[in-house]
Curated annotation (Swiss-Prot):
PANTHER family: CARBON MONOXIDE DEHYDROGENASE, HYDROXYLAMINE REDUCTASE. Its EC number is 1.2.7.4. The keyword Oxidoreductase applies. GO terms for biological process: generation of precursor metabolites and energy; response to hydrogen peroxide. This is Carbon monoxide dehydrogenase 1. It catalyses: CO + 2 oxidized [2Fe-2S]-[ferredoxin] + H2O = 2 reduced [2Fe-2S]-[ferredoxin] + CO2 + 2 H(+). It comes from the Archaea. Binds 3 [4Fe-4S] clusters per homodimer. Binds 2 [Ni-4Fe-5S] clusters per homodimer. Cluster B is an all-cysteinyl-liganded 4Fe-4S cluster; cluster C is a mixed Ni-Fe-S cluster which is the active site of CO oxidation. Cluster D is also an all-cysteinyl-liganded 4Fe-4S cluster that bridges the two subunits of the CODH dimer. Pfam families: Prismane. The lineage of its organism: Archaea, Methanobacteriati, Methanobacteriota, Stenosarchaea group, Methanomicrobia. [Ni-4Fe-5S] cluster binds at residues 266, 302, 340, 448, 478, 519. Gene3D superfamilies: 1.20.1270.30, 3.40.50.2030. GO terms for molecular function: 4 iron, 4 sulfur cluster binding; anaerobic carbon-monoxide dehydrogenase activity; hydroxylamine reductase activity; nickel cation binding; peroxidase activity.
Length: 628
């Protein structure tokens, strides 16, 4: 096997700001994720194929993919069983991450209603009452706090339910609900499905690949229509439902003369308070005393998306830019909560003056300053954290500072409510545009970054190809940040769209790519798709719509992909999931699910070919609806 040549900065990322910081890191002898990836090569083939099992201590067992060695594990598990079990455990972990996020949001909401979290309040009373009505909670003669208390109890009950249904699944079209029920995959309770995943994958329990994967779909639905949707909705009540606004993105948002505070992770419970604390007059005065012109908060990953959507707080970058933000030498504090935070940040921040501050009771990292965050004294803790950053400003080493000039304007804040409002209150104008052919369909492009592929290349080129062919794109997470950095989240980007989509965007004053939020906010896409399907009297699987995750890497993305497909949306993955060790599992995911759930996966690393797969699917659905 030949040696892999060391990648250049250009080969690692298409983003100019990232390329500059990668070169700076190399010149300074700083290790990044790309360096660690190269040291891992060649990666374990058994792991890549999904045919390694270590679920009991008789193993680990490996299946020979060429049929020349072991065909079964010690217990008799075949490649099909092992691959399916491993995939189910990935779905369980992803669903748990989203759903635990939701649980914390609801618990904060509950504490607020009980007067134990005074830093928080109700920002969207309209949504509060709407959600309460969905749960059959009477509003008559009750205060906002009383209604909120009953809603908090109802939402918490979704996690521990044993028989279901999860209330938000009622938002799906009737045809989809009937299908889930007939297949036995309607989720019963958020926690129950995740626990059952772990039970089923214990030695000697579920050993039929199809049966295992059907429970994977059920568990993912408890995420998409349960945990993630609960998180989105209750965060809107607490912090406000996003509306369109402008902001800026990329590493160039960092300031030369202000205290730079990075918020990184996924839970806005913390980041909302950090944004407020950064405007505290006492802390701003302290910043001046320390020689700074002010306090600049910028986001990384989804907690950044949350504050971007609601406050216009700038975004410094997506997942693979977290290290590069520190490499600028200009970050006083990297404040983290949970999910997608590299433990490598501990060593990295030690090379600069940056304080690496961990805050979550359930997540700590090497090399952190521990400042545990609790809702009961949320704002006070946030002030202490920001104060730590401000007091660190004089320690900045000017000789190490190099902030790329690249930053890009963007328009964000397209919640489902904001989109419907822009359309005049109903999806009818969008449906008319689709029926008339000006808009061919909708593409939902989401997901992570992955060092196995060039940073942002898949995200940006796939989306450009879709809008060029008159597909309106909705986006969340790290894809949204990639598109923003590429200038696709401004109305002027309509110039890159096909004539039909361009005309629609110009008429509405919107970009051809709509930023709908963080990863849990993919639930907003489900709500929008359901609204369109119900207006047409069809199932989601009948819509001219397709999904993609060009650079996915996390277990959360596996759960997302599963619930999107289970909801009826054909989805293209840009990096290969660990399933190729089983022909049966691969065939079920890429073909067989069409006959079961009305949608399936495809795997295509080339973003242009992936776009063609999505366009072909959209055209097929248009034809079936008689729209061609």
């Amino acid at each position: 096997m030949g040696c892999k040549m060391k990648q250049t900065a250009f080969e690692k990322s298409i983003d100019p700001a990232s390329q500059k910081m990668l070169e700076k890191a190399e010149n300074e002898g700083i290790e990044t994720a790309w360096d660690r990836y190269e040291k891992q090569l060649p990666q374990c083939s058994f792991g890549q194929l999904g045919i390694c099992c270590r679920n009991c201590n008789m193993g680990p067992c490996r299946i020979d993919p060429f049929g020349e060695g072991a065909e079964k594990g010690i217990c008799g598990a075949t490649a099909d069983i092992i691959v399916a079990r491993n995939l189910l455990r990935m779905i369980a972990a992803g669903a748990a991450a989203h759903s635990d996020h939701a649980r914390d949001a609801v618990l904060t909401f509950k504490k607020m209603t009980e007067g134990e979290a005074g830093s928080y309040g109700i920002k969207d009373k309209t949504k509060l009452f709407s959600l309460a009505s969905e749960y059959g909670i009477s509003l008559e003669g009750k205060s906002h706090e009383e209604v909120a208390g009953e809603l908090a109890s109802a939402l918490l009950a979704e996690f521990g339910k044993q028989e279901g249904p999860i209330q938000y699944t009622r938002r799906a079209p009737e045809a989809r609900l009937r299908l889930w029920t007939s297949l036995g995959i309607e989720p019963r309770g958020v926690d129950r499905e995740i626990v059952e995943c772990m039970h089923r994958t214990h030695i000697g329990v579920d050993n039929d690949a199809t049966h295992i994967l059907l429970h994977g779909l059920r568990t993912s639905l408890s995420d998409g229509w349960g945990g993630s949707m609960i998180a989105t909705e209750i965060q809107d009540v607490l912090f406000g439902t996003p509306e369109p606004k402008k902001s800026t993105v990329n590493l160039g948002v960092l300031s030369h003369d202000k205290v730079n505070v990075i918020i990184h992770g996924h839970e806005p419970i913390l980041s909302e308070m950090i944004v407020q604390a950064a405007e505290d007059p006492e802390l701003l005065e302290l910043a001046k005393e320390k020689g700074a012109a002010g306090i600049n908060v910028a986001g990384i990953c989804c907690t950044g998306n949350e504050t971007l959507m609601r406050h216009g707080t700038p975004i410094a970058g997506n997942f693979l830019q977290q290290e590069l933000a520190v490499v600028t030498g200009a970050v006083e504090a990297m404040i983290v909560d949970v999910q997608c935070i590299m433990p490598a940040l501990g060593n990295l921040t030690g090379c600069y003056h940056t304080k690496f501050i961990s805050t979550s009771p359930k997540a700590d990292f090497p090399g952190t300053v521990r400042m545990e965050f609790h809702e009961e004294r949320a704002y006070d803790t946030a002030r202490e954290i920001v104060r730590t950053a401000v007091e660190n400003f004089p320690n900045r080493n000017i000789e190490k500072v190099n902030i790329p000039e690249e930053k890009q304007e963007c328009m964000v804040g397209f919640s489902a409510e904001a989109i419907l409002k822009a359309l005049g209150g109903s999806p009818a104008p969008l449906i008319d545009a689709i029926a008339g052919g000006a808009v061919k369909g909708i593409g939902a492009v989401v997901g992570c970054n992955n060092v196995k592929v060039q940073h942002n290349y898949g995200h940006v080129n796939l989306v450009k190809e879709l809008i060029k062919n008159n597909v309106l794109v909705v986006t969340t997470g790290c894809n949204a940040i990639a598109c923003a950095e590429a200038g696709l989240l401004v109305p002027e980007a309509a110039a890159q769209a096909g004539d039909g989509l361009k005309g629609v965007c110009e008429a509405l004053g919107i970009p051809p790519v709509l930023h709908m939020g963080s990863c849990v906010d993919i639930s907003r896409i489900l709500v929008l798709a359901s609204a369109i399907a119900k207006s047409l009297g069809v199932d989601i699987s009948d819509l001219p719509a397709a999904g993609a995750a060009p650079e996915w890497m996390s277990e959360k993305a596996v759960s997302i992909g599963a619930y999107v497909v289970s909801s009826g949306v054909f989805t293209v993955l840009g990096t290969v999931p660990p399933v190729l060790g089983s022909q049966a599992v691969t065939a079920l995911l890429t073909k067989g699910l069409d006959n079961v759930i009305g949608a399936s996966f495809a795997v295509e690393p080339d973003p242009f070919k992936a776009a063609n797969l999505m366009l072909e699917h959209i055209e097929g659905k248009r034809k079936a609806l008689g729209l061609n």
